[in-house]
Amino acid sequence: MNENLFASFAAPTILGLPAAVLIILFPPLLVPTSKHLINNRLITTQQWLIQLTSKQMMTMHNTKGRTWSLMLVSLIIFIATTNLLGLLPHSFTPTTQLSMNLAMAIPLWAGTVVMGFRFKTKNALAHFLPQGTPTPLIPMLIIIETISLFIQPMALAVRLTANITAGHLLMHLIGSATLALSTISLPSTLIIFTILILLTVLEIAVALIQAYVFTLLVSLYLHDNT
């Protein structure tokens, strides 16, 4: 029986029960904590990456924006870990589900907008009407800017979903082609398998880049509203 092309994106179950809870709780096990005075190389590397990410995200923010540092660092680690675990064979990638990505994007976007209207009300309202706009275009521009504001969380979620899903589908197709050619032509199989390895390396990079892009855009929205 041929496997459905989108079967890998279906929510998994264990003994008929949803495995989402186990999937969510598993990544923290990959980030060990040390009780020793001197950390080992793994924990030192993790701390260096967290400090580097925090520095990259927080340099542009003021005091109010820096209160989000823990949230943003946790977000990028969660998305990156989830994307990388999804590259394992027969695993499930939650970030291929638009519903999950919207559940991350909408609250974060709404939080930045609420902060903008609370602490910088005039500047937040000024975004709806650029300075120097001709009077006849004012109603149209207000509508356009309002629509663009509400599209931001959708763009965040769709971008992450589309990039991760496209990569997984391409890997699935090339992997299927490798298996199909294995009994027909050995040279063709080696070529396709080499392409599959290169694509896997590329997908690892995409998984990390998409986590960074998602978090960076949230950080930019926060910067605009604080």
From Swiss-Prot:
GO CC field: mitochondrial inner membrane; proton-transporting ATP synthase complex
Single biological process term from Gene Ontology: proton motive force-driven mitochondrial ATP synthesis
Species of the source: Pan paniscus (Pygmy chimpanzee)
Subunit structure: Component of the ATP synthase complex composed at least of ATP5F1A/subunit alpha, ATP5F1B/subunit beta, ATP5MC1/subunit c (homooctomer), MT-ATP6/subunit a, MT-ATP8/subunit 8, ATP5ME/subunit e, ATP5MF/subunit f, ATP5MG/subunit g, ATP5MK/subunit k, ATP5MJ/subunit j, ATP5F1C/subunit gamma, ATP5F1D/subunit delta, ATP5F1E/subunit epsilon, ATP5PF/subunit F6, ATP5PB/subunit b, ATP5PD/subunit d, ATP5PO/subunit OSCP.
Reaction equations catalysed: H(+)(in) = H(+)(out)
Alphabetized PANTHER family for the sequence: ATP SYNTHASE SUBUNIT A
Family affiliation: Belongs to the ATPase A chain family.
Gene that this polypeptide is encoded by: MT-ATP6
Keyword DNA repair carried by entry: no
Keywords, alphabetical: ATP synthesis, CF(0), Hydrogen ion transport, Ion transport, Membrane, Mitochondrion, Mitochondrion inner membrane, Transmembrane, Transmembrane helix, Transport
MF (Gene Ontology): proton channel activity; proton-transporting ATP synthase activity, rotational mechanism
UniProt protein name: ATP synthase F(0) complex subunit a
